[in-house]
From Swiss-Prot:
One of its GO terms (cellular component) is membrane. Almost completely overlaps CAF20. It comes from Saccharomyces cerevisiae (strain ATCC 204508 / S288c). The keyword Transmembrane helix applies. It is found in: Membrane. This is Putative uncharacterized protein YOR277C.
Length: 102
């Protein structure tokens, strides 16, 4: 499994583009090349969102892990272009995880 070239800057751009659109006030810290962690407070719970973009031909696949202070990590997956992340998919995934929807 290899990370997309220039994944650090691409992920930072993707995160910065994504954050305002789904209304999160977040602290972003780059943990390692290709892996980004985002900490934010939502409905009184602290969530940590981590994802890595992996190049598979022409499609980048993002692996997202969401964990809160009161639950075990809940992974879900999205496929998007690293420069234009699908905020609707991420928003839907987060809402499903928060409210326990299938």
């Amino acid at each position: 499994m290899t990370y997309a070239s220039s994944s650090s800057s691409s992920l930072s751009k993707a995160a910065n583009a994504l954050k305002p659109r789904i209304g999160l006030s977040a602290t972003i810290s780059l943990v390692s090349a290709g892996l980004l962690e985002e900490i934010f407070l939502l409905f009184g719970l602290t969530f940590k969102v981590s994802w890595a973009m992996v190049a598979t031909g022409t499609v980048e696949v993002g692996v997202v892990s969401v964990s809160s202070s009161s639950s075990s990590p809940l992974p879900f997956f999205l496929a998007s272009n690293v420069h234009q992340p699908s905020e609707s998919v991420v928003t839907l995934g987060l809402l499903c995880l928060i409210f326990g929807l299938p």
